[in-house]
């Protein structure tokens, strides 16, 4: 289950379109927490959400982003299916701010 093409996730202006985020940051959708942990080092399971902080190279400036996934089934183990729900459009100065944004979604 994924968000229809062209739809925003929560608050417009703070979030990228899901398809744009998948392409820009190479985020998989759907996936599993186990797969994300092998690709990204900053991942937290937070209740029904999985939050990720990632780094994207941009010349001469830091570009950290936050992403929020939600469990798609009742299996909340590392092998449960998760779907991408929100990705920050703003670029953060560090991964801590990116995680804080993702938790707030």
Feature-to-residue mapping (PLM):
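Negatively charged, low-complexity tracts enriched in Asp/Glu with abundant Ser/Thr
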Residues: 2-48
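Acidic, low-complexity, intrinsically disordered interaction modules
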Residues: 34-39, 43-97
């Amino acid at each position: 289950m994924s968000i229809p093409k062209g739809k925003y996730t929560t608050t417009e202006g703070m979030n990228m379109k899901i398809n744009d985020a998948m392409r820009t940051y190479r985020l998989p959708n759907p996936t599993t927490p186990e797969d994300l942990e092998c690709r990204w080092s900053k991942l937290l399971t937070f209740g029904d959400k999985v939050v990720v902080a990632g780094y994207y190279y941009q010349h001469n400036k830091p570009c950290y982003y936050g992403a929020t996934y939600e469990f798609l089934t009742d299996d909340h183990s590392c092998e449960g299916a998760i779907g991408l729900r929100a990705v920050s459009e703003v670029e953060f100065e560090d991964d801590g701010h990116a995680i804080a944004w993702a938790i707030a979604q």
